[in-house]
Amino acid sequence: MDVCTITGMTARGRLRVSRSSRWCWVQGGGMYMATRLGCIQREMCEGAVSGLWEEGEDGGTRTQMGKRAREVGLEEGVLLLWRTLDLGGVGGRKLGSEGQSLSENSEQRSLMRWGCGGSSERR
């Protein structure tokens, strides 16, 4: 497993990603999200991350991640999320449609460029 360190903006922390898997980063609700199911739309991320983390320096546990993933209709282990500085404004919309392309949105494209693959930093 390669480790990507995310800094700047509203994100702080480390997120482990596998170089051999198909990962994409999406920013939503003060979170950065990675999914093996493919790239999903930003507004869907905002609903998916709601209520995922307990307060704490490390943000949460793998068990909590699996529980929340099931609640939004994903299999346990599909989502790897890391807590960020600000979880405000996150809605309760259910995550519904996986695999949607980020190519139509230049902001999301830029997030994907720096986020997918080995170690990188957001400047």
Swiss-Prot record:
Species this protein is from: Encephalitozoon cuniculi (strain GB-M1) (Microsporidian parasite)
Top-rank taxon: Eukaryota
Upper taxonomic lineage: Eukaryota, Fungi, Fungi incertae sedis, Microsporidia, Unikaryonidae
Biased composition (Polar residues): 98-109
Annotated segments matching region Disordered: 89-123
Name of the featured protein: Uncharacterized protein ECU01_0030
